[in-house]
């Protein structure tokens, strides 16, 4: 790329930075005063004219300054040399805050609150998708000789407790056998495979004796736990930040809030995140949702090196601090994965 093109990109980068910081359209004189561009105001004016002709910036109807377009933001994001790093103190604070979560729900609630505070946008975290989770542990506890508590723990930290009414009593030996059979069928398997295994076990042990009936009743309850669609659950925080930036949405705030409430668009965008550590930025119309015009979403997946638990990210106006937001989303996602993977 020629030096003139590089210089124009520096002008575009300066316009984006100033507009994000001030919300005010930017003129050539202001750019020369604030940034060390190394050229005259006349040259900057010419560069801005080229950027406008190519669709990277535009002139608001009442201003002599210019603001970035969606195309301009996309060029800026695509050519980010590096993401604004979080300080060691910030990273340590994030890690300590998330590690203090007592269980999966608490960790995710903390993550949403933290991400909304860091970015001053709407933070969204998807509960771990069951299809990618593995059964890490199964506990079978006798509450009474005819009533059991089943506790299923997945590798993503989800704990599900279910009561099984046996209809008949079983002794300690039968309870031990039941625990062993169910554990062998479930532990270490993906939830989709575990549901098949427990159904097969119930089919194989269809017999009139007490244990066969106990396996059947336990399998019925466990299947309810294993096939429940928790991937449709979202946690959101910081929606008040949308109203703080209401002027950025040009009258479309209500439709954006409705889209968030319906969750369909957000779930679709989060479901597209299949690789932990990879951050995706969708700007304006790139969300492919008419009701989300004027917004950008910065999303990623969280999980371990070999397992994606779910998607997460932030939503805000296209006038967004992209370097800072990308860094915050990536850092929080990394620490969620570490915290949940260690449990």
UniProtKB/Swiss-Prot annotation:
- The source's superkingdom equals Bacteria
SUPFAM superfamilies registered for this protein in UniProt = GAF domain-like, Winged helix' DNA-binding domain
Q: Which GO terms describe its biological process?
A: negative regulation of DNA-templated transcription
Q: Does the keyword Repressor apply?
A: yes
Residues spanning the signal sequence: none
Q: Does the keyword Transcription regulation apply?
A: yes
Question: What Gene Ontology terms describe what this protein does at the molecular function level?
Answer: DNA binding
- InterPro entries attached here? GAF-like_dom_sf, HrcA, HrcA_C, WH-like_DNA-bd_sf, WH_DNA-bd_sf, WHTH_transcript_rep_HrcA_IDD
Which keywords label this protein?
A: Repressor, Stress response, Transcription, Transcription regulation
Q: Which PANTHER family match?
A: HEAT-INDUCIBLE TRANSCRIPTION REPRESSOR HRCA
Q: Which family does it belong to?
A: Belongs to the HrcA family.
**What's this chain's function?**
Negative regulator of class I heat shock genes (grpE-dnaK-dnaJ and groELS operons). Prevents heat-shock induction of these operons.
The molecule here is called Heat-inducible transcription repressor HrcA
What organism does the record attribute this protein to? Answer: Mycolicibacterium paratuberculosis (strain ATCC BAA-968 / K-10)
């Amino acid at each position: 790329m020629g030096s003139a093109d590089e210089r124009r990109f520096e002008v575009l980068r300066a316009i984006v930075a100033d507009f994000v910081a001030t919300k005010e359209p930017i003129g050539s004189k202001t750019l020369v005063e604030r940034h060390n561009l190394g050229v005259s105001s006349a040259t900057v004016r010419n560069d801005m004219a080229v950027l406008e002709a190519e669709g990277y910036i535009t002139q608001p109807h009442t201003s002599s300054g210019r603001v970035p377009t969606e195309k301009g933001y996309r060029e800026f994001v695509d050519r980010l040399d590096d993401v604004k790093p979080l300080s060691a103190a910030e990273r340590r604070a994030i890690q300590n805050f998330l590690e203090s979560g007592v269980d999966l729900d608490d960790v995710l609630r903390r993550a949403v609150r933290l991400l909304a505070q860091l970015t001053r946008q709407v933070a969204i975290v998807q509960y771990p998708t069951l299809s990618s989770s593995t059964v890490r542990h199964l506990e079978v506890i006798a509450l009474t000789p005819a009533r059991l508590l089943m506790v299923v723990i997945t590798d993503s930290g989800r704990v599900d407790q279910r009561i099984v009414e046996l209809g008949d009593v079983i002794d300690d030996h039968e309870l031990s056998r039941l625990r062993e059979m169910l554990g062998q069928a479930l532990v270490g398997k993906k939830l989709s495979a575990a549901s098949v295994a427990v159904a097969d076990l119930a089919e194989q042990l269809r017999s009139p004796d007490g244990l066969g009936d106990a396996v059947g009743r336990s399998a019925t309850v466990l299947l309810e736990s294993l096939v429940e669609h928790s991937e449709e659950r979202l946690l959101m925080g910081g929606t008040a930040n949308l109203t703080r930036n209401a002027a950025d949405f040009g009258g479309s705030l209500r439709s954006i809030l409705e889209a968030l409430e319906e969750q369909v668009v957000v779930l679709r965008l989060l479901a597209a995140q299949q690789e932990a550590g990879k951050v995706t930025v969708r700007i304006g119309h790139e969300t492919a949702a008419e009701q989300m015009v004027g917004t950008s979403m910065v999303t990623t997946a969280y999980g371990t090196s070999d397992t994606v638990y779910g998607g997460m990210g932030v939503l805000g106006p296209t006038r967004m601090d992209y370097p800072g937001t990308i860094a915050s989303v990536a850092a929080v996602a990394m620490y969620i994965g570490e915290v949940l993977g260690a449990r």
